Every structure is written in C-alpha cells, then in structure tokens.
Regions:
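Acidic/glycine-enriched connector segments
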Residues: 1-150
Length: 150
C-alpha cells in the first residue's frame, strides 16, 4: 500500500491533471492499493482529485481511495453534500486539529497530510506560501517527493 498527498499553489494556469495522473501511475504500477489525501483548497487540489478519479476509472481492479482532508468543519459540506459524497471516498477532519485556532488549522492540516503520506506530489514555482512551506516540511521529514514541472 502507498499513501500520497499533494501540494500546489491555489492558482494553476492551465490544467495539470495529466501530469498528476502520470505521477500517480508510476506509484501504482507495482502496487494494488493507493490511498490519496487531498486538501481541497485550490485549483491544484481540484486537479489532483480529478487525476485520482481518472485513475480509479482506469484501474477498477486496484484499490484507489480519495480522501478529502479538511482543517475544520465547513458549511460547504452541507450545502453541496451530494457533490462531496459522490466525489470522495471519505471526508476527514483530523481529531488533532480540533483544538487549533482556525487561522493555524490549514498549516497544521498540511503537516498532517505529509505526516500520513509516503509521497508528496507537488507543483510549486514560488518560494513562499503554504504550498512551499508544505514542500519544505516534506523534505525535512524525508518524504519521497515527485516535483512536477509547471
């Protein structure tokens, strides 16, 4: 079993779904199980989730799971309940984040994503911001990183 997560800037210019899907295929080619954690906070997360869904259709005999990991409860889960229930296998708000102030919850969630994954698939071109901080954290933790070209 392999677990992976994603990091990228909120704004992505053009689709990168195929690049992400290609990276995921290298992970699953010799494995039967792939668990993917996505943050759901920007365009890169959306493209990442789409790539995982494409892979699920392409490899129906493999166990590929897509989990949305949120930093805190959000109203959009109730407003768009059907979308979330059909788009993700699981929706998780880690218990460790319950006591964290909401302004610090997103960086804490990003660290949780890295801590609970074997791989980080990232597309980062700026040396600041949450995605960059997540990449640096993954590097310090010795995680395997697949850095995609923009």
């Amino acid at each position: 079993m392999i677990t992976c997560t994603f990091a990228g800037h909120r704004e992505v210019f053009g689709s990168c779904t195929q690049k992400i899907e290609n990276a995921l295929e290298t992970l699953i080619e010799n494995e039967d199980t792939l668990y993917c954690y996505v943050g759901g906070m920007g365009e890169f997360d959306g493209f990442s989730a789409a790539a995982v869904r494409n892979l699920k259709r392409k490899y129906p005999n493999k166990e590929i799971r897509l989990t949305l990991v949120l930093p805190y409860m959000q109203q959009k889960l109730n407003e768009y309940k059907e979308y979330y229930e059909t788009s993700f296998d699981d929706i998780l708000i880690p218990a460790e984040l319950a006591e964290i102030h909401y302004k610090r919850a997103i960086p804490a969630r990003n660290r949780w994503l890295v801590d609970n994954s074997d791989y980080l698939i990232a597309m980062i071109w700026r040396d600041y911001g949450g995605a960059y901080t997540t990449l640096r954290y993954a590097q310090k933790q010795g995680k395997k990183i697949i850095l995609l070209e923009r």
